[in-house]
């Protein structure tokens, strides 16, 4: 699972909503095709990993893949059957804050049909609407 090696603060503030569009990471920089987010959402490390596995299965050894998102925000949670109060819960899982327009994954060295199938399968693993974009 993806997670930071170390963080400055263990329990960050959770922002009430994700505003605006992606300013950085909004263009296909490394590969030929990319999977672009169309809506704002938190994407968990498990979801990123599931999508990465699907794309790598399609790419096999002939293609190359880049993951352009990283879960660097800790989400805290109280244990089950715990009364309210008593401070903030312990870190439970990690999420990446994704804004509309952000490129999530990039691939290179695959034909268009294989890329479309791989990205569609990866998109099914993610909680957001996405679209396939090309460098050209």
Curated annotation (Swiss-Prot):
GO terms for biological process: translation. It comes from the Bacteria. The keyword Ribosomal protein applies. Gene3D superfamilies: Ribosomal protein L10e/L16. InterPro entries: Ribosomal_uL16, Ribosomal_uL16_bact-type, Ribosomal_uL16_CS, Ribosomal_uL16_dom, Ribosomal_uL16_sf. GO terms for molecular function: rRNA binding; structural constituent of ribosome; tRNA binding. PROSITE patterns: RIBOSOMAL_L16_2. The keyword RNA-binding applies. Keywords: Ribonucleoprotein, Ribosomal protein, RNA-binding, rRNA-binding, tRNA-binding. Transmembrane segments: none annotated. GO terms for cellular component: cytosolic large ribosomal subunit. Binds 23S rRNA and is also seen to make contacts with the A and possibly P site tRNAs. NCBIfam families: rplP_bact. PANTHER family: 50S/60S RIBOSOMAL PROTEIN L16, LARGE RIBOSOMAL SUBUNIT PROTEIN UL16M. Belongs to the universal ribosomal protein uL16 family. HAMAP family: Ribosomal_uL16. Part of the 50S ribosomal subunit. This is Large ribosomal subunit protein uL16. It comes from Elusimicrobium minutum (strain Pei191). The gene is rplP.
């Amino acid at each position: 699972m993806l997670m930071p090696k170390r963080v400055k603060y263990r329990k960050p503030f959770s922002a009430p909503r994700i505003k605006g569009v992606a300013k950085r990471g909004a263009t296909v920089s490394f590969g030929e095709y990319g999977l672009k987010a169309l809506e704002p959402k938190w994407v968990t490390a498990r979801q990123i990993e599931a999508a990465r596995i699907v794309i790598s299965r399609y790419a096999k050894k002939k293609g190359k893949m880049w993951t352009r998102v990283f879960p660097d925000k800790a989400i805290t949670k109280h244990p089950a059957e715990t009364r309210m109060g008593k401070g903030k819960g312990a870190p439970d899982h990690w999420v990446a804050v994704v804004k509309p327009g952000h490129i999530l994954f990039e691939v290179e060295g695959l034909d268009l049909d294989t890329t479309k199938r791989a990205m569609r399968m990866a998109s099914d693993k993610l909680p957001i609407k996405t679209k396939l974009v090309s460098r050209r």
